[in-house]
Design a protein with these regions (language model features):
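Non-catalytic, usually N-terminal nucleic-acid engagement modules in DNA/RNA processing proteins
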Residues: 1-56, 60, 66-70
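Extended two-metal-dependent nuclease catalytic cores across DNA- and RNA-processing enzymes
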Residues: 22-26, 76-185
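A short glycine/small-residue-enriched secondary-structure motif
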Residues: 61-74, 90-96
């Protein structure tokens, strides 16, 4: 069976950056390469261990999304993106381009919208699809042929199918994930 891996770029970049926050990786030019190194390590690990048939890396757009246009306060309380992450993103995109790995972006839509759309379509076509992200919100998308591939603290990954998502949150159906997370705040 064909395998598709969809990476949530910013979630993985942030995770990589903060994993090295106490001991950042600085190159000879003074550039903090923690996010680049962590992201590339994740990419290499997936390519060598999972050998996906298809792979795409989704990024959030630079401009507004349909959510910010509908509700101006959407994510307004978030802190500014650290400058080291801002510098890392073009480097990561350049590496992906050099490796001929598709960078997925859609004006007005967040990476999770792009991943959700592609994952559900591919899963319905019989492609085993893995959404690589630490973001719990993706649990609502898990179903037949669509799974979460979550990084574990301390290394490795956890593959979550619908049964595991439901057991993890004590719910009957993955469509309830969003309600549960909404109640949790």
């Amino acid at each position: 069976m064909d395998k598709l891996f969809l990476f949530d770029a910013y979630a993985l970049i942030y995770r990589s950056y903060y994993a090295f926050i106490k001991n950042p990786r600085i190159n000879s030019k003074g550039l903090n390469t923690s996010a680049v190194m962590g992201f590339c390590n994740t990419l290499h690990e997936v390519l060598t261990k999972e050998k996906p048939t298809y792979l795409g890396v989704a990024f959030d757009p630079h401009g507004p999304t349909f959510r910010t246009e509908a509700y101006a306060e959407y994510k307004a309380q978030r802190e500014e993106t650290p400058e080291d992450i801002r510098r890392a993103v073009p480097i990561i995109k350049s590496l992906l381009k050099a490796m001929r790995i598709p960078v997925l972006e859609a004006d007005g839509y967040e990476a999770d919208d792009v991943i959700g759309t592609l994952a559900l379509k591919a899963g319905a076509e019989g492609v085993m699809t893995y959404m690589l992200t630490p973001d719990k919100d993706y649990g609502q998308l898990v179903r037949e042929n669509v799974m979460m591939y979550r990084p574990r603290h301390g290394g490795g990954y956890e593959t979550l199918d619908a049964e595991k998502v439901c057991a993890k949150y004590g719910i009957a159906n993955t469509s309830q994930v969003i309600d549960l997370l909404g109640l949790m705040g």
